[in-house]
């Protein structure tokens, strides 16, 4: 899994240990990968003797993560979730799950910030542009959802 996925997984495991709630792992195979993100996460958990409650490995985007995951949850009588994702991705993820009828408690991780007060921090750099691309994608995704379109 990617570093982003690992960060989310680590926080999900922390919350699982604190609450005893079951874990639903969601994520399809990125690009031409043979194994889905959800299957890769499940393998990591099993190495540490943690069995996921559900593994949803068919989704291709955030909307499908919600759509397919909610099917598993509703079959088990679950209508409220702690939703773990990066802070910058949570608004779109929460919206997607709420549109599927879930009561969502956001559980953000992966906050990106740099502190500093010098003038140097006001000069744009390549890392800032890279992070901005995430924000732009999320805002475009939310707009697309509100206009009834799929992922941009």
Task: Please describe what each predicted stretch is.
Residues 1-129:
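A structural signal for short, hydrophobic/glycine-enriched beta-strand patches
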